[in-house]
């Protein structure tokens, strides 16, 4: 009997192809049209999206992307490609494809790439450590849509999340320790996760619980007292309430209260991107220092570090 051939699909959110208003507009249109991301009535949402949000937001966001753009593309794309290549080197007999929910390379192109390698079974690893319907759910939906058009489909293993995975927590902890060794131990370690509307959590999305799990496990691995670690949520969009406390408001409050030294990590981001490099490392640094804080460091995402790649290899090992 022929041995089953396994392929790995690394999935992430996506990125514009260029730091231009036109490219950002195309990307945001696809992203903000997904009901998993914005579930508002289409009769209300389409005119607002096309008539107000895209024309006004695209030029501003393009400037932000330009401020962090790298030689090989957006940071998310550069680091995601590095992750794909490093994992392929770690698992030389296993094809590894990269697909994005929005933009290029698409999830469909990633599936087709693996099928062209004659794989019988695809292990899907969404690079979102904490499940949310708006991220992991979107990957699931798109994968189902893609496979629904195939006459023959491969076996599928779908990794829901890895919020409390031992290798993941250890990699985060080692990254924090390295930052403490370099910059000194701060008064507070702030863990900033991407937010979602509070309503999504009220309706059953267990994302906040998964974030709390990671926070608890990381604090335990570091041996830090609970009062020395704080969890917040960033990147809110629109007018409805999102998960709280908000990162920017918390940093302002901490600076005003006399907290002098803060280090910030974003455990929910597997790769550095606009939201970490610009929003957290730059914007929120200014918020904290402007409110009276003295010292602020951003701890980079795990990106393509050896520990992160080893974690990915171990995650998919059960399916190989």
UniProtKB/Swiss-Prot annotation:
The keyword Aminoacyl-tRNA synthetase is annotated on this UniProt entry: no
BP terms from Gene Ontology: heme biosynthetic process
Binding, Fe cation: 194, 275
Enzyme superclass (EC): lyase
Catalytic activity: heme b + 2 H(+) = protoporphyrin IX + Fe(2+)
GO MF annotation list: ferrochelatase activity; metal ion binding
Main location: cytoplasm
Top-rank lineage group of the source organism: Bacteria
Residues forming coiled coils: none
SUPFAM superfamilies: Chelatase
Pathway connected to this protein: Porphyrin-containing compound metabolism; protoheme biosynthesis; protoheme from protoporphyrin-IX: step 1/1
UniProt keyword rRNA-binding present: no
InterPro entries with a match to the protein in the record: Ferrochelatase, Ferrochelatase_AS, Ferrochelatase_C, Ferrochelatase_N
Record keywords: Cytoplasm, Heme biosynthesis, Iron, Lyase, Metal-binding, Porphyrin biosynthesis
Enzyme Commission number, as recorded: 4.98.1.1
Compartments, as annotated in UniProt: Cytoplasm
Signal sequence range: none
Transmembrane annotation, as ranges: none
Cellular component GO terms held in the UniProt record: cytoplasm
Subunit record text: Monomer.
Function: Catalyzes the ferrous insertion into protoporphyrin IX.
PANTHER family: FERROCHELATASE, FERROCHELATASE, MITOCHONDRIAL
Family under the similarity heading: Belongs to the ferrochelatase family.
Protein name from the UniProt record: Ferrochelatase
Organism encoding this protein: Shigella sonnei (strain Ss046)
